[in-house]
Amino acid sequence: MSLSRPLRLFLLLLPLLGGLLLSMDWAGRQARQQALRAEGEQVRKQLDLYAGSLQTLIERFRSLPAVLALDPDLRAALAGPIDGELQQRLNLKLESINLAARSSTLELLDRTGLAVAASNWNLPTSYVGHNYGFRPYFRQTIAQGSGRFYAVGVISGIPGYFLSHAVRAEDGSFLGAIVVKLEFPDLERQWNQTPDLVLASDAKGIVFLANHAGWRYRELEPLDTVDRFELAETRQYDRQPLTPLRHQTLRSYGEDRRLARVESADGEKDYLWQSLDLPNDGWTLHLLRDTASIQDDVATARLAAAGTWLALVFLGLFLHQRWRIARL
């Protein structure tokens, strides 16, 4: 029984269309893999640069508290009572050192954590007279001789990285601590020059640095009861509401790279998400690159594959027609 003309046409077009779709799918997948691989290498290099600039900034000041802890004036002041005149001399000394070092603030704490002098003594947000014994960096300094802690300033409301070192008497007894605070506005402005999202999160997975304000103070992972209690006790992100950042992994490319779908104020968007641990400070640096350009590469590859397939089909039809004519 002979087939009808429409059916014959359908059976002819079916493998042609199937081949067209398969070639477009294959080309799209190959283009995606190549683009993700190339983008991943670029993202990792970019992230290494950001990590280097952040660590260089911190290392510039990491030794400052240890050096100041040896200052005889500071040691002598903490060893005895501090009157108004001595406190003013200490304030001016710290102000001068802070200006020369280009740190954000310097403060001198006694053995209870009370700020007896500070470089910002003449500002409304002065630390002088406030007790910081509850801050982890002070507790670490008592136990280990030095401490570090990123937090929002309780008085100033300005976030920063606190580095501290113990001030000790000649016999080694603990007298107090000298603390330097670092703020990172210049670093975030540098990050703003890229269209990518650049984030830094702490050990709890809370974003504390970001080149876009709406991404700061976001929870990358759910916080448990212990974490929330500790945050409240230390006032780490004092008066800053923490909101979850909803995201899901679409595909993993090793331990530190993945394709993720992230929900933000602009809606859902897919990112190539690269992470880099900073073990010295217990932080993780993240770079999120929009995959829109990758989608463009995929679409271009699919169109090229479709064009190639159709060209081969027409070439085949042409050769078939020539063969039929030659047989006549």
Regions found by a protein language model. Give the residues of each.
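Extreme N-terminal signal-anchor transmembrane helix of membrane signaling/transducer proteins, especially
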Residues: M1-Q33, R37, A306-L317
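Amphipathic coiled-coil signal-relay and dimerization helices
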Residues: A76-A77, G113-N120, V207-N211, Q274-S275
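Extracytoplasmic/periplasmic sensor domains and loops in membrane signaling proteins
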Residues: D83-L92, W121-V152, R216-E263
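Solvent-exposed, extracytoplasmic
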Residues: Q88-A100, A177-R235
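Extracytoplasmic/periplasmic ligand-binding sensor regions of membrane-associated signaling proteins
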Residues: L99-A100, A118-Q190
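Extracellular/periplasmic juxtamembrane segments that couple receptor/chemosensory ectodomains to their
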Residues: E230-L303
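Cytoplasm-proximal transmembrane signaling helix
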Residues: T291-L328
